[in-house]
UniProtKB/Swiss-Prot annotation:
This is Transcription factor CPH1. InterPro entries: Ste12, STE12_transcription_factor. GO terms for molecular function: DNA binding; DNA-binding transcription factor activity. One of its GO terms (biological process) is regulation of single-species biofilm formation on inanimate substrate. The gene is CPH1. It comes from Candida albicans (strain SC5314 / ATCC MYA-2876) (Yeast).
Amino acid sequence: MSITKTYNGDPTSLVPTQSVKESLRLIEDLKFFLATAPANWQENQVIRRYYLNHDEGFVSCVYWNNLYFITGTDIVRCIVYKFEHFGRKIIDRKKFEEGIFSDLRNLKCGADAILEPPRSEFLEFLFKNSCLRTQKKQKVFFWFNVPHDKLMADALERDLKKEKMGQRPTTMAHREPALSFHYDESSSLYTQLGKHMETQKRINDAATSSTSNTATTLTDTGVSSGLNNTTSGGGSDSATSTHNNNEASTKPSNGSEKSSPEYTTTARGRDEFGFLNEATPSQYKANSDYEDDFPLDYINQTTQNSEDYITLDANYQAGSYANMIEDNYDSFLDATLFIPPSLGVPTGTAATATTSNQVAFNDEYLIEQAQPIRTPLPPISSSTISGLLQPKSAAKFFSLQSANGGEEFFPAYQNDPSTANAGFVPPISAKYATQFATRQVATPTYIKAIPQTGAAAATGNGGQPQQYYDQATGNAFYPAEIPVSYNVVHPESEYWTNNSGAVATTAAATAPMYDASGFPIPINQSYMVMNEHEMVPYQYMNSNGAMIGMIPPHQQQQQQQQQIAMGYQSMLRQQQQQQQQQQQQQPSSTMTKKKKQIHSFNNNKSLSSNGGGITKKSHDNNNHSKVKTSYGSLNDVVNSKVTKVINKEEVKQSQT
């Protein structure tokens, strides 16, 4: 009977108590993270996360511009997580979040948060790290300015008041400790919630101690040899267990009733607060696979284990392959691999220099893609280029040569007839595994043709062969036909040669721009815009419309066109000025004529009154004898001397 009294119930009755204890422990862990997340960060750490569950994900503490931030989305996640472990199930998530965001409006910008513009760099960083659901303009809160417990208490108070009023709440109690919580409107819900959480913790601690005492009693019973000893031992253990439970129930709390439950739920002595200086408390590290932090949060510079951490460096290369090479890649390849034998240090014999490793390279490959050739190929003469070793499109390699001797790439072994270079095989093309020509340069120079009219597209102007015009030198030449026809306008990804030294010689060995019977290919040329059709110096439209046939104009023709255009514009200006002067002079000329008539009448009258005599003929008579002359053109009117003289006389008379 003593065993039954000591056990005090069946094992199934302790399962809900264990779940409540686990829920309270998870709430304590989250509160501890919210209180100590900005402490003990690594050197390059920018974010620290706490995993909630599969539905809510992570809560992140972000370090940005020397400050620690938390988003409103993460605040809602924390409150939802606490409600679930408190025993209340969320039935209307949208209304629940609206109430929390309404409370967050009390946290003002500047004092408790910052206002970020839409799609800013900070919001983009938060969005990529799943701290936000959108990049709209919003507030991001300072880490220590968010009252998490007060926000949870306000959300719970809204639901409890709705339940009393008969309205539909956003959450519903479905298990402990929410089922045993009774709301008293006369006191603060914040204080009531703290008391209730502390009471639940004491009850679970008592149940845990009772379970441990029962297990000890059962063990002692199996070891003892007599039933009396077992019964007496069980009675003593039962008495001890009862005494411990009474002490646990009457033990006073270290925190006050008005303090936050974040600090009152865990009762610790003053000597037990050394964990605040540690990265992780020792009680959480014991008997668990606890890691230092989330692996994506920072760069671990002490170890080279790339499986544990993901670096923020864009140029980082994981694996042992990248770590064994220096930053400048000097230790990856031998530097003497790319040095010709003639420039290397002689070792006493020419054979040693000849057998050094050769490198195949050309313009199509980077230096990192160059590969050494293990077996040097024998020299190939230029007479065998039309054989089977060369592709058909490679015939132009040897038909175009440069006048500078090809000293850009191989100055050592081509012009030096020494014994060291006597047996050296020239580098070969990595694309065709064939040799370069002796005087070849791999710099392309494009040859552009002068477009002709459609009727003379085959033979050029006047039955002459097709002309080609080099824009670099300004020379025209006539190409010769060779067996290999090649399209110069659309070259393949192969070599071209430089024809700066000998334009005519190069063009003579080049394939034509297009066949005589083929369709002409238009070439991009600069357009000449003419506003007036009379000023076009030559016919510029083609009959067939396939291409524009224009000969490159000479400098004298361009100067003549410019002079004609300038003369035409000046003539228009003179006409406009002359018309304006005539309009202004019409009213003034009528006034001067009237004044002249009055003046002449007064003179004649005064002479007749004086008794007559010989008088001088007045100049006014000339005005009556004027003859209006008609000029043939506007230039005659402008350059007329008669008009200028008459105007001068009228001005003098008007002044007198």
